[in-house]
């Protein structure tokens, strides 16, 4: 029997959360984990509650208008997985926690702000099964925000 390590375990949870996404363009999942390895919240990218999703509409404004990934976030009707998880957890459960993200290997400027403000300490990202694991810290994100 093989027991997977904590990082792989939490990335699998994030991967499962991504399967709830109702975004036609990308499926991203996030999980917030306390320092004692307890899951505090999960999130996935999708429309806010009671808003018709692009999946239900079978239409995505960003796809139809060839909007490049990483730009013009205000044109998207969805909430990012990271933001959704932070909202679900609340700041008290985010302090000194770790966030695991499945579905991309970068963090947009909007989510950098959320993560830094929430008190999350470390972040692990994995785009897909074949990509390398990316690790960063809130301090790294803070530095990026300072220098952008």
Place the predicted regions along the sequence by residue.
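Zinc-dependent deaminase catalytic domain
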Residues: 1-148
């Amino acid at each position: 029997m093989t027991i997977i390590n904590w990082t792989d375990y939490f990335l699998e949870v994030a991967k499962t959360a991504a399967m709830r996404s109702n975004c036609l363009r990308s499926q991203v999942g996030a999980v917030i984990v306390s320092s004692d390895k307890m899951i505090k919240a999960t999130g996935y990218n999708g429309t806010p509650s009671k808003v018709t999703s692009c999946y239900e509409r079978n239409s995505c404004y960003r796809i139809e208008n060839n909007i490049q990934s990483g730009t013009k976030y205000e044109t998207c009707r969805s909430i990012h997985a990271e933001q959704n998880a932070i909202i679900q957890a609340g700041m008290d459960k985010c302090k000194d926690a770790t966030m695991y993200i499945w579905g991309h290997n970068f963090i947009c400027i909007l989510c950098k702000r959320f993560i830094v403000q929430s008190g999350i300490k470390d972040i692990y990202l994995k785009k897909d099964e074949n990509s390398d694991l990316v690790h960063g810290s809130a301090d790294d994100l803070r530095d990026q925000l300072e220098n952008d």
